[in-house]
């Protein structure tokens, strides 16, 4: 009879309820883009347990006392059924991974050609909805979110960047969805969503140079998660008719001025919730993978690239992380100081969103010019080097040909000179 290890059961039970274990559960299909395919240990263990489970089902119990423990048998059967489900799910995911990998990585040019008109259409259609049908804009935002986010998850997971999905901008998007569909009556949630979207998300476009590159799914999705949520909050507060807003979003009916103290309190509370979850599931539980370089986070990227020479990075652990966390918090408070203006003046809020959109568009234009311009320069330089190398290879051969030709010319002249001398001698003898 197949004997179960209680430690294995406990480990599997704990993993089944962990959010990060769901990500690690998919590890057998790790990225083919940045590394070779690795047949992960999760799949090997699951397949081994499935084989044991198949043998267990074919064998009858050898001991009579096993039949007197239905609880143990039910627990074993449930656990093995879970392993069976995991293996079948992994097989389905692997079967789906091959065409998706071809679409998003190997033959991405076709997808980018199709995504270019899709992005253009959405830019104009979003503007049309905001002006003509504002009551449907939050619905369209939700649809786009659940279209783009699975793509973002898949592409980030394949490139081992899926820990970036736990960043604050995604948390704010989830808060917006919670307000729209579950807690539309929550004044504090709307106040926090408005402050986060018009504060942290909008200024992130300027600070971190989000680029509206309309053929790129990755860059367009980044602009979507930073620009569209403040547009949704703008439409809900400034664009909806009062009667509809009272019925659909009662939490958005606030005075023309924000209570700064309450706003700081609520946003700090939501920020604390996010930081606690982030540091527990990512910083602590996955610290080994982060330190080994298997996974990348925003903190690791900043401290190893843009701010690697910053004095705070060179401090002993955990001071760099503490300084980074506090800096994020004060940055969030600083960026929401102007939210009182965006609440009070509709035109000012519209102009601010327009500036953010134009800033992202300018970054996108800069990307196109710099990226393709630099690639063209590199191609020209490469061709120039090839021509120079070819000329250097041909130079010795040409010199040899020229030297041979000069020798032949000298021989030819000498022969002609001798012939002329003989002819002159014969003529002189005849004359004599």
Swiss-Prot record:
Q: Name any one Pfam family assigned in the record.
A: DUF2838
Q: What pH dependence is recorded for this entry?
A: Optimum pH is 6.5-8.5.
Q: Which reactions does this protein catalyse?
A: sn-glycerol 3-phosphocholine + an acyl-CoA = a 1-acyl-sn-glycero-3-phosphocholine + CoA; sn-glycero-3-phosphoethanolamine + an acyl-CoA = a monoacyl-sn-glycero-3-phosphoethanolamine + CoA; sn-glycero-3-phosphoethanolamine + (9Z)-octadecenoyl-CoA = (9Z-octadecenoyl)-sn-glycero-3-phosphoethanolamine + CoA; sn-glycerol 3-phosphocholine + hexadecanoyl-CoA = hexadecanoyl-sn-glycero-3-phosphocholine + CoA
- What happens without the gene? Decreases the levels of monounsaturated PC species and increased those of diunsaturated PC species. Does not significantly affect phosphatidylethanolamine, phosphatidylinositol, and phosphatidylserine profiles.
Task: Name its GO BP terms in alphabetical order.
Answer: phosphatidylcholine acyl-chain remodeling; phosphatidylcholine biosynthesis from sn-glycero-3-phosphocholine; phosphatidylcholine biosynthetic process
How does the entry describe its membrane topology? Multi-pass membrane protein
| Enzyme Commission number(s) from the entry | 2.3.1.-
> Residue ranges of region Disordered?
413-432
**Name of the protein in its database record:** Glycerophosphocholine acyltransferase 1
Native source species: Saccharomyces cerevisiae (strain ATCC 204508 / S288c)
Query: Which lineage is the organism of this entry classified under, starting from the top rank?
Result: Eukaryota, Fungi, Dikarya, Ascomycota, Saccharomycotina
């Amino acid at each position: 009879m197949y004997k179960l290890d209680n430690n294995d059961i406990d480990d599997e039970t704990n993993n089944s309820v962990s959010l990060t274990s769901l990500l690690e559960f998919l590890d057998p299909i790790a990225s083919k883009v940045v590394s070779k395919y690795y047949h992960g240990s999760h799949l090997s263990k699951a397949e081994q347990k499935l084989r044991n489970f198949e043998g267990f089902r074919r064998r009858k119990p050898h001991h009579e006392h096993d039949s007197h423990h239905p609880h143990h048998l039910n627990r074993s059967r449930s656990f093995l059924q879970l392993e069976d489900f995991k293996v079948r799910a992994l097989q389905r995911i692997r079967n789906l991974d091959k065409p998706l990998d071809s679409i998003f990585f190997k033959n991405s040019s076709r997808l980018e050609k199709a995504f270019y008109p899709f992005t253009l259409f959405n830019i104009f259609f979003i503007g049309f909805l905001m002006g003509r049908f504002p009551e449907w804009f939050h619905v369209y935002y939700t649809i786009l979110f659940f279209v783009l986010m699975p793509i973002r998850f898949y592409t980030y997971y394949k490139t081992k960047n899926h820990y970036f999905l736990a960043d604050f901008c995604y948390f704010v998007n989830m808060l917006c969805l919670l307000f729209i569909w579950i807690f539309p009556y929550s004044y504090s949630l709307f106040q926090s969503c408005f402050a986060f979207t018009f504060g942290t998300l909008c200024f992130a476009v300027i600070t971190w140079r989000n680029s509206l590159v309309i053929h790129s799914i990755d860059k367009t999705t980044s602009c979507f998660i930073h620009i569209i949520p403040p547009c949704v909050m703008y439409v809900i507060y400034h664009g909806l008719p009062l009667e509809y807003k009272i019925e659909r979003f009662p939490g958005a009916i606030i005075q023309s001025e924000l209570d700064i103290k309450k706003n700081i309190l609520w946003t700090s509370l939501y920020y604390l919730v996010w930081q606690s979850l982030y540091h527990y599931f990512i910083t602590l539980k996955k610290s080994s993978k982060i330190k080994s370089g298997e996974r990348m986070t925003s903190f690791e990227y900043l401290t190893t690239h843009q701010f690697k020479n910053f004095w705070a990075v060179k401090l002993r652990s955990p001071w760099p992380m503490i300084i980074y966390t506090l800096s994020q918090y004060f940055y969030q408070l600083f960026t929401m100081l102007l939210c009182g203006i965006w609440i009070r003046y509709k035109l000012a809020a519209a102009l601010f969103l327009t500036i953010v959109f134009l800033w992202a568009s300018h970054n996108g234009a800069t990307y196109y010019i710099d990226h393709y311009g630099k690639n063209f320069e590199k191609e020209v330089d490469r061709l120039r080097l090839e021509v120079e190398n070819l000329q250097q290879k041909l130079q010795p051969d040409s010199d040899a040909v020229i030297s041979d030709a000069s020798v032949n010319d000298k021989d030819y002249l000498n022969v002609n000179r001798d012939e002329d001398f003989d002819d002159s001698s014969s003529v002189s003898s005849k004359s004599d």
